Amino acid sequence: LDVTNKIALDGSMREILRMLNTKLSTFVYNITQEGMDENWRSRRKAVSPMHDVLTVAYFLDNSIVKLKPAYIDVVTEGIARGQSIVDIGGHWNENKCNAKYAYDVDVVKFYKLFYKEIFNEDITDLVEGK
């Protein structure tokens, strides 16, 4: 369900930031280090999440993600407090829908937009075969 896992910044895409060697790319490279380290410690995956970046990308080009209607709620108590619950099949809320959720993302389109809009870099040749 969490499409942001598909666009998590991996080592090779993160290394491009370092090689661009601008003030902004260096900043993004540095702030993604903690996410990279935490994901390695907890999941043994060398990626840094980019949840907020995907949201911004959606506002710039809504064809980047595919959406489906569903009933979505946020848990307010207990061990799952703060987690979003998506009733995908409408089993618990009689097929009522109050929002849409992203179920897929175009990874290549996302990275092309990310590098072009933020760093003015065309990385098409680097991501097309990804």
Regions found by a protein language model. Give the residues of each.
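N-terminal acidic, glycine/proline-rich low-complexity segments
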Residues: 1-130
